[in-house]
UniProtKB/Swiss-Prot annotation:
Protein name, entry field: Alpha-glucoside transport system permease protein AglG
InterPro entries: MetI-like, MetI-like_sf
Pfam family, one: BPD_transp_1
A single cellular component GO annotation: plasma membrane
GO biological process annotation, one example: transmembrane transport
Residue intervals passing through the bilayer: 13-33, 179-199, 202-222, 239-259, 288-308, 344-364
Organism: Rhizobium meliloti (strain 1021) (Ensifer meliloti)
Coiled coil residues, start to end: none
Length: 380
């Protein structure tokens, strides 16, 4: 068989991988494109139409009679519907017939008033007599606007009050919440992998069982425990130490399980040779196990950092929603408003929040696969 010829199974695998890559990449690309689009266009068309003109229906109220001017014996109110962007394709003065007239045509209004709208959005309301009334005429129109990309969405998010403080709060939460469970889990994993003691198998089974416990079930009991301990010592329960301990508790089962599997797959001969040379368990752990286990440590660090950085629920419960301790995800939720309809803010915020996780991922990603797969077959 010619080795240069690939089997149908190989082609099927490659196509499947390509399909998975596209399924993961396309939503991210759509998010990026949406974050750079004008908010009016984003509200009426999808990101896949970003390079084509978009059509939207809108209504604008003309200036009131106080702004009318006299010109050649006529009274005129003028303005522009589009603010210099796009082209009007139809207009009207009633919600029942919003596209009754074409640009350049004249619509007869009440009391002898006449409305004319041009394709560039400029309009005039002309009357032979002085116009009365405190409210301006409503003008319905359909406009076609060319594609427009802008950084205004990012500027609005970055200029919001408290963003810088919330960014530092998220770092203050995420970094210790990643380092602390790694340190604790590394010692526990070494003991479960290489230090025989009674009940080791039962303890490992308990750790595996904790992996399936829903986080939400333990939030309220833990908060009550923290409040009780805080009241006993006379300190507030909603502190950084509290959320560090919470994230440590939630992350330890996965960390211990992942690191134990990796350490159990390391060559036994290395540890035995070190013991023959008089090395203690602590020396073996620090000088041999930890350096060899760096891929597994980096793999868990990626998962833990991503979780704690993007977390909102645990941060609100254990840290609170005060301005001085609000994390970045909480600040961005406040920017979206109660209805969450500001898509331009949502898309720009999403890309701002993933900058730091992307840096962490690309810095450690070469260890990710090695850390997840090594030790998955061979056990200690």
């Amino acid at each position: 068989m010619n080795p240069s010829r690939r089997s149908p199974l190989t082609w099927a695998v490659h196509l499947s991988v390509l399909l998975l890559v596209l399924l993961w990449t396309l939503p991210t690309a759509g998010l990026l494109i949406s974050s750079l689009r004008d908010k009016d266009q984003l509200a009426v068309s999808g990101w896949w139409t970003a390079l084509s003109s978009s059509s939207r229906n809108a209504v604008v109220r003309a200036p009131s009679a106080e702004d009318q001017v006299e010109r050649d014996g006529k009274f005129v109110i003028s303005g522009n519907l589009l603010e210099g962007r796009g082209e009007v394709s139809a207009f009207g003065f009633s919600s029942r017939e919003p596209t009754k007239f074409k640009p350049g045509e004249t619509a007869e209004l009440n009391d002898g008033e006449r409305l004319t709208v041009q394709s560039d959005g400029s309009f005039e309301i002309v009357s032979d007599q002085r116009m009365e009334g405190s409210r301006g005429q409503r003008i319905f129109f359909t406009a076609t606007t060319p594609p427009r990309f802008t950084l205004d969405n990012y500027a609005e998010v970055l200029s919001a009050a408290g963003i810088g403080r919330s960014f530092l709060n998220s770092l203050t939460v995420a970094v210790p919440s990643t380092v602390i469970p790694i340190l604790i889990a590394a010692f526990a994993a070494y003991a479960l992998a290489w230090m025989p003691f009674p009940g080791r198998a039962v303890l490992l089974a308990v750790v595996v069982g904790l992996l399936v416990v829903p986080l939400q079930m333990s939030l309220i009991p833990l908060l009550q425990l923290y409040n009780g301990v805080g009241a006993f010592f006379g300190v507030s329960a909603k502190t950084y130490m509290g959320i560090w301990l919470a994230h440590t508790g939630f992350g330890l089962p996965l960390a211990i399980y992942l690191l134990r599997n990796y350490m159990a797959g390391l060559p036994r001969e290395i540890m035995e040779s070190a013991r023959v040379d008089g090395a203690s368990d602590f020396d073996i752990f620090v000088k041999i196990i930890l350096p060899l286990s760096f891929p597994a440590l980096a793999s868990f660090a990626i998962f833990q950092f991503l979780w704690t950085w993007n977390d909102l629920l645990v941060a609100i419960v254990f840290l609170g929603a005060g301005d001085d301790k609000l994390v970045l995800t909480g600040r961005l939720v406040n920017l979206l408003g109660s209805r969450g309809g500001n898509w331009e803010i949502l898309t720009a915020s999403a890309f701002i929040t993933i900058v730091v996780p992307l840096i962490v991922f690309f810095a450690l990603q070469r260890y990710l696969v090695r850390g997840l797969l090594a030790g998955s077959v061979k056990g200690g």
